[in-house]
Amino acid sequence: MMTKTNSILLPGTLFDDKGGWISDPQFMEVMKSSEMLAHGLGTPVADAVTSFEVAADGVYNLWVRTKNWTAPWSDKPTPGVFMVGVDGSEVETVFGTGSEHWHWQYGGKVELKSGAHTLKVRDLTGFDGRFDSILLTQDDQEPGDIDELRRSLLDLPTVPVDKGHFDFVVVGGGVAGMCAAIAAARLGSKVAIIQDRKVFGGNNSSEVRVGLGGRLNIGEYKSLGYLLNEFGPARKGNARTADVYEDEKKAGAIAAESNITSFTGYRVTDVIMDGEDTLAGVIATNVDTYEEIRVMGDIFTDCTGDAGLGVLAGAEWVMGREPKSEYNEPSAPEVHDEVTLGASIQWYSELREEPVQFPDIDWGLQINDETVQNTRRGQWYWEVGMRNDMIQEAERIRDYGMYVAYSNWSYLKNHSEYKDEYANEEFAWLSYCAGKRESRRLKGEFVLTENDLRDFVIYPDGCVSTSWYIDDHEPDPENAKRFKEPWLSCGKLTPLDFYPIPFRCLYNKDIINMFMAGRNISVSHLALGTVRVMRTCAMEGEVVGMAANLCRELGCRPRDIYKDHFDKLQELMKKGVGDPTMPYLQTYTLIDTTAVRHEDC
């Protein structure tokens, strides 16, 4: 049995010096941890180093929780490898070479004296080797569940730390969650916003780098959108330099609101229910320390994108494409499938004054002169995972996006007919955060469908206006012919007029005090194609924040706003909560959605 007296657990997120290793929590729902990633773009990253104490002399088994990330696609030796050393002496095992799944890889025995010691993790390639935790134990059995080990071997509090009670709890800090939090706060609610990243903005942050799309200040409620204009980036573009996305402006917008308490770097991992249909609070786990906090509230909103809060609370959710029999949508498949819009893994190169080398890899996708992409930037159409589970296989999807980017760039630089043109180009940035478009969607009291949009069926509770096509991505036909797993996409675009989304799509049918805003609202797969762009999501959040504050003022539930108080919400939507006198910057990526346009499908 592993105890504190015979075992030492060293989570990578708690290392004294992480060196060049990145702590990434985006897969915590599945792997139960943040991963430490050597994301050096082909150049080994600086060592991660930590100290630890041993109580008594002894021989310890060394285990590392890791995975072989290229194993799903290549039987060549993986590049995701690293070494582990104790007190300056590395063990013989090369880590990261085992299973494609997270597992404990054995590193042999280490003799340790009582007292202080140092452990070092040395990356070998810069190609995304990864680990979670390192375990030194005198127990001879293989380690088990990582969450149980943390609870037994780390000095974690046994009870979540109480962070108080709030009028409105926002889970998710993309533009939808930000607007929901700020809107409610400005109207008088005490708000908590919980965000598992260290930055705000979601897909529009410097971690993912998707430019804002769609229109603000349109439709019946033309004041909706001034709020996003206050903190949205002034410049357009996908896969640009980090400064374009103005993370500091977004952080400042949240910090400026005295009614908002921000919990960044916390992921909601459990819920506290009052009966089967009412949320009373959430348990959030620090993505570095694994300490838990408790946040109680009256009204909640799921702005996670993945419907994480709703799923924990037991709300009904869907993923994939509904069959034609469900809503009689003309573009729906005959039978339900798990196909979703994909995730983009973006990248770019930069021109240098001197030639720059890039490894000639043998473990990558087989690229040739016919399939190589002659480009210095991979943006939205570098899209993967349409046939995979966007939750359970999220890491595999992200990894495949990186795998093909490395493969294409290596061939382009070292073998292609264009290689002389690329001699001075350096592979400068590759996102390790998947830019998701779709995963789980929650059910509200109304599900918006393709028919509503095409037939322009207007409902009395219309609120936020769409401003995008029905933009349903598919694998690029030529790419799909050549590769078992396509990695380029195209858009199948259906022209639309601006359409007012029913308010009933923004609150949950099962959890009576929960709103939704963003890409996990109550729509069909096809309808998601127009509501999912970020400026539309932001206005959804703004409306949800207004409605949440009305719930506080009136002592009611989200459903009651629709049934009994929609006129009050309408008055708020006419006013908006943003400042209309600020310079108007959101004039880019505005498209004519009524025009016929093709993206090569």
Q: Which residues fall in each region the model found?
A:
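Extracytoplasmic
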Residues: 1-160
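Flavin (FAD/FMN)-binding glycine-rich loop and adjacent Rossmann-like elements that form
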Residues: 157-159, 203, 265-268, 275, ...
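Loop/turn elements at helix/coil->beta-strand transitions in domains of secreted/extracellular proteins
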Residues: 165-167, 187-190, 258-261, 297-298, ...
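N-terminal Rossmann-fold NAD(P) dinucleotide-binding loop
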Residues: 177
